[in-house]
From Swiss-Prot:
InterPro entries: Cyt_c-like_dom, Cyt_c-like_dom_sf, Cyt_c_1A/1B. It is found in: Mitochondrion intermembrane space. The keyword Transcription regulation does not apply. The keyword Electron transport applies. One of its GO terms (cellular component) is mitochondrial intermembrane space. It comes from Fritillaria agrestis (Stinkbells). Keywords: Acetylation, Electron transport, Heme, Iron, Metal-binding, Methylation, Mitochondrion, Respiratory chain, Transport. The gene is CYTC. This is Cytochrome c. Belongs to the cytochrome c family. PANTHER family: CYTOCHROME C. It comes from the Eukaryota.
Length: 113
């Protein structure tokens, strides 16, 4: 598996489209917004997995204790259930490196507090 450092440059607008079609039904990025089926992703970068206040995470997410950054998200988004066995997230992942890079570009800007 290629790493984020080998990924193509991400495109914010393409990532926004991916978020709206693949992620927004379960997540929001809006500061102060409540959780949906999944946690609010605002402030995602630099945060440890399973620590968003007010959201009930699986033990797997809490115990993984990964700090979210471009590299960890790139690997996670390929196959969430393989990266964190036991996660509640039902999303199958993004197989294309460009899609993952685009989504990360969007999330990096859209989730900054």
């Amino acid at each position: 598996m290629a790493s984020f450092s080998e990924a193509p440059p991400g495109d914010f607008k393409s990532g926004e489209k991916i978020f709206k079609t693949k992620c927004a039904q379960c997540h929001t990025v809006d500061k102060g917004a409540g959780h949906k089926q999944g946690p609010n992703l605002n402030g995602l970068f630099g945060r440890q997995s399973g620590t968003t206040a007010g959201y009930s995470y699986s033990a797997a997410n809490k115990n993984k204790a990964v700090n979210w950054d471009e590299n960890t998200l790139y690997d996670y988004l390929l196959n969430p259930k393989k990266y964190i066995p036991g996660t509640k997230m039902v999303f199958p992942g993004l197989k294309k490196p460009q899609d993952r890079a685009d989504l990360i570009a969007y999330l990096k800007e859209a989730t900054s507090s």
